């Protein structure tokens, strides 16, 4: 009988945030082992709750959400997103430039599928959120990784970006605030990226899902606000800021010189129509979520959970011999560096597996974020401080005698 294998289009597609190490953790859990999951930015399991007003409004509107919406989304949702984009100073945005999706993830896939021909190149940061590289690859393109510099607060290396541009380069992706590093890019760095994009006629694609999770009174600047003459695509959503990752509601905003993307927009509309619409109940709460009280603000100031957990994990990790980390300014991730010579580490995935098996702690190795050296890993600091204290204590104990074989 004929056997059925996976498509060859998936041969070079990786997504290790839910990959082999996570699969091993699942097997351990099936056998009754309690695993502490520091691998994925899912707020709900760690006690973060959706604002009551949002839940109430959804429940009141459920009977009105039984049919399809416009393929781009409900007018009320898109109007609220448009107004939010205007507050962020995105230029030349109308309701028709807004696309809702089942989370930003769906829209990343849609946006790359509409853009890329086989062999086209997209500049993607390293480290990155791996879905970007996966979706570029799946669409037939090539993700060309530019370095973000740990010695410079994990900001993009502008000279490296310039070196990576070829006549096949179509777009540059930035992730700001950044996952996995927690970096926040200042206006000056963003302006340099805009200048490069302008010189080389690149589309700017910006993932800004963590833009409302910025700490220490820093300002988040949308790169599209600096590029009215370029064609920009900006992504955000409610999964992180409103702690509703399971509701699956994100959006994509087109801005700037949209005449440059006229044919591309036709492709976006075609793909948007093909999936009919994003889930309507989640769309129904966008207006309330964006227009109402922003409870996330309580988490990211001194005394707030995310702020205090960041403070703890940053110090605790840096106190472990052989570990160093740059302090995150946003989101809820930290990307520590490990002294590979000290621990004889040549395979970071094996390091993550060894930690999982010995200490029952699940982290994602740096290679899962397209970082090409075996010297980093990502920690999610959503668990309460007492849990993080237990986790960092176990990590310190593990490393006290660890030598990779």
Model-derived segments and spans:
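Conserved PLP-anchoring active-site segment centered on the Schiff-base-forming lysine
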Residues: 114-136
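PLP-dependent enzyme catalytic core of the Aspartate aminotransferase-like
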Residues: 87, 163, 344-346, 354-363, ...
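Helix C-cap/helix->beta junction micro-motif
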Residues: 31, 139, 199-200, 230, ...
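N-terminal small-domain helix-loop-helix segment of the aminotransferase-like
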Residues: 2-6, 11-103, 110, 277, ...
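Active-site phosphate-binding strand-loop segment of PLP-dependent enzymes
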Residues: 144, 149-220
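Conserved core segment of the aminotransferase class I/II
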Residues: 225-304, 314-316, 399-400
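A short helix-loop-beta submotif of the ANL/AMP-binding
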Residues: 137-144
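Conserved glycine-rich beta-strand-loop-beta hairpin in the small C-terminal domain of fold type I
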Residues: 287, 303-314, 325-339
């Amino acid at each position: 009988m004929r056997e059925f294998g996976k498509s060859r289009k998936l041969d070079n597609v990786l997504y290790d945030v839910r990959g082999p190490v996570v699969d091993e953790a699942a097997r351990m859990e099936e056998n009754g082992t309690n695993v502490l999951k520091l691998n994925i930015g899912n707020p709900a399991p760690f006690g973060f709750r959706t604002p009551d007003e949002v839940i109430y409004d959804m429940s009141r509107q459920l009977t009105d959400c039984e049919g399809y919406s416009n393929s781009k989304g409900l007018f009320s949702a898109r109007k609220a997103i448009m107004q939010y984009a205007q507050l962020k100073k995105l230029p030349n945005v109308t309701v028709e430039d807004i696309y809702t999706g089942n989370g930003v993830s769906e829209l990343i896939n849609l946006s790359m599928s509409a853009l890329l021909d086989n062999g086209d190149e997209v500049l993607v940061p390293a480290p990155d959120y791996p879905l970007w590289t996966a979706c570029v690859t799946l669409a037939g393109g090539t993700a060309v990784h530019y370095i973000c510099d740990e010695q410079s607060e994990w900001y993009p290396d502008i000279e490296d970006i310039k070196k990576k541009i070829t006549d096949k380069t179509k777009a540059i992706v930035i992730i700001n605030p950044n996952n996995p590093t927690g970096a926040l890019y200042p206006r000056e760095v963003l302006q340099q990226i805009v200048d490069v994009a302008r010189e080389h006629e690149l589309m700017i694609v910006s993932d800004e899902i963590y833009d409302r999770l910025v700490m220490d009174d820093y300002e988040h600047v949308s790169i599209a606000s600096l590029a009215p003459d370029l064609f920009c695509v900006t992504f955000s959503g409610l999964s992180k800021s409103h702690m509703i990752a399971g509701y699956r509601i994100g959006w994509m905003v087109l801005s700037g010189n949209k005449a440059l993307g006229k044919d591309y927009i036709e492709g976006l509309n075609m793909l948007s129509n093909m999936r009919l619409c994003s889930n309507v109940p989640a769309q129904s709460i966008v207006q309330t979520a964006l227009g109402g009280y922003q409870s996330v603000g309580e988490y990211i100031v001194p005394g707030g959970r995310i702020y205090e957990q960041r403070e703890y994990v940053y110090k605790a990790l840096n106190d472990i011999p052989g570990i160093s980390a740059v302090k995150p300014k946003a989101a809820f991730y930290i990307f520590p560096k490990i002294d590979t010579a000290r621990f004889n580490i040549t395979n970071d995935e094996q390091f993550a597996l060894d930690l999982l098996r010995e200490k029952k702690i699940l982290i994602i190795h740096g290679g899962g974020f397209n970082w090409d050296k075996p010297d980093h890993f990502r920690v999610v600091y959503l668990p309460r401080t007492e849990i993080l204290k237990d986790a960092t204590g176990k990590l310190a104990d593990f490393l006290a005698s660890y030598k990779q074989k």
